Amino acid sequence: MIAHFLCILSYNVNTFVILNVYTKLTMFCTTNSLPMDLLLKQGSLKQEVESFCYQIVSESHDQKVGILQSEDEHLQPSVSKNSEGELSRVKFISNSNKITTFSKKPKRRKYDESYLSFGFTYFGNRDAPHAQCVLCKKILSNSSLAPSKLRRHLETKHAAYKDKDISFFKQHLDSPENNKPPTPKIVNTDNESATEASYNVSYHIALSGEAHTIGELLIKPCAKDVVMRMFDEQYSKKIDAVQLSNSTVARRIKDLAADIEEELVCRLKICDGFSLQLDESADVSGLAVLLVFVRYRFNKSIEEDLLLCESLQSNATGEEIFNCINSFMQKHEIEWEKCVDVCSDASRAMDGKIAEAVTLIKYVAPESTSSHCLLYRHALAVKTMPTSLKNVLDQAVQIINYIKARPHQSRLLKILCEEMGAQHTALLLNTEVRWLSRGKVLVRLFELRRELLVFMDSAFRLSDCLTNSSWLLRLAYLADIFTKLNEVNLSMQGKNVTVFTVFDKMSSLLRKLEFWASSVEEENFDCFPTLSDFLTEINSTVDKNICSAIVQHLRGLRSTLLKYFPVTNDIHAWVRNPFTVTVKPASLVARDYESLIDLTSDSQVKQSFSELSLNDFWSSLIQEYPSVARRAVRVLLPFATMHLCETGFSYYAATKTKYRKRLDAAPHMRIRLSNITPNIKRICDKKTQKHCSH
């Protein structure tokens, strides 16, 4: 039988079919008790016949069989442990010279230039090429290099070009865009993309201060509807993989806040110095909340950021405040020696003796200074006024509160204002906390004086004030002066406001006050538009007593502002404008003054001074003029106002409401009050597993 089989392999190899080979090999292995799985272990019989060349050797005495791979020597048939006993009768390499081979190689199609008429060029090896469409760049297998298959692709995928001749495709092939090498494109998996999208949505939820449930209840359904209308339902279903449950959004926000905090700590560790701004207030649940902001130089600018937002567990004393800040510093290994200034308001918990926070900070940071909010100084200064004007202000507030404290009265006033065609339909509430809006409150009251005269009950004791022209003249003046003071106050708020900015505004206000007082003495009221229009309306003049009270108020206001903002010889004037310095400033040593001379002699630096803000100008010179630039930045680092803390508590109150009393608002404040954008890609890379489950 063996001789018969070898004869068939020798003389009839060209006429064999795979079925005959398989049948005879099976019979041979069965007769000689050989494991058939050795021949078929690597896959199907078709794959074995195409990949291997079997060599069967027959010896008349022991009938040993050898199997030898012809080309793919790295593919060795694997043998199970159960066949080890029979492996002695199988040789993979035979030393016998009596070897007859049988092989079948896969067919390789060649590329023909005529295939370009179907819009196809070749890709890869010229001997074994793949077909590539010149229109859509799709790559087909070697077996697709047939005119019928190429024509089918052109007619089905690019029917608009099926009648084009070969010159069209040749021109398209030779275009510069097609000659560019293919760029590998890294595509995220669905889980990775869904996780990143979840972080992005959570980031915007935290920025808006909305509840976590808005992600699953509103954002995801809206996103699905938009995608379904703009694309199709298949893409809309992919949005289901984005995790936006309540707990998931909460975890995402904590991860984002942690990433921002990590970046901030790294910046503070490498910066030259920083200043602090701190304040404390109570939230809706009664907890004392501490907000601390930090101001530091990073790259070529001065940045402001939230350092920490913590709830004080015990009494909100200075010692407790200091311990909270100090714990954060020690935990993150931030050096206190870099602190140059601490800004606070004038409350007892924020400033005081050794036991208070500012003093304790100055104890661990000996070179640090302390400063008070300049807006608070301004608020104290404007409270001083003559008795006649103070009485009018108090009576105006009583009229407003009489209506605003009674909802029914407010509704009736609204109806009356609408019927009379008034521009406004409600009064503005005045409180001591909202002193910044006092000008708007008085202006609104004066504008609705006619409607209030009709509305007010004659039994109300202050109803006669609305018919008293002297009272209305004083009210018009107060509305004008408080509007002007509010405008000055608002101009001193915002980010990156320096001490120079505040004192410049105060200097301007002092000059205006003297000008206004002189104008009133000359009975010229053009500086006060509301008062001037009212005088024109009633065709009257201002009584001398009223003029005297106005002049007294303006001069007294100027004197009070000079007390809180004294005009002194500024030793840091060279920081404000280094190009006006002609004599060595007392605050600079000789070496720094020489550097300042070099700086002011540079024409490019002079041009940048007119283009950049003061903070950015000095920060950009750190590399070129390090000594004098660092001294200037140190002068610019202290906070001038408590604007950031006031804004922060407003955001805190809007985030942690009575409906969300159990919320940990610290991560939300970190995201909402920070200028640092979290690195979502870095956060996702830290996740070892990215599941689409909630």
Swiss-Prot record:
Keywords: Metal-binding, Zinc, Zinc-finger. GO terms for molecular function: DNA binding; zinc ion binding. Coiled coil: none annotated. May be derived from an ancient transposon that has lost its ability to translocate. It comes from Bos taurus (Bovine). This is Zinc finger BED domain-containing protein 5. The keyword Metal-binding applies. Zn(2+) binds at C133, C136, H153, H158. A zinc finger (BED-type) spans 109-165. InterPro entries: RNaseH-like_sf, Znf_BED. PROSITE patterns: ZF_BED. SUPFAM superfamilies: Ribonuclease H-like. The keyword Metal-binding applies. It holds the Pfam family zf-BED.
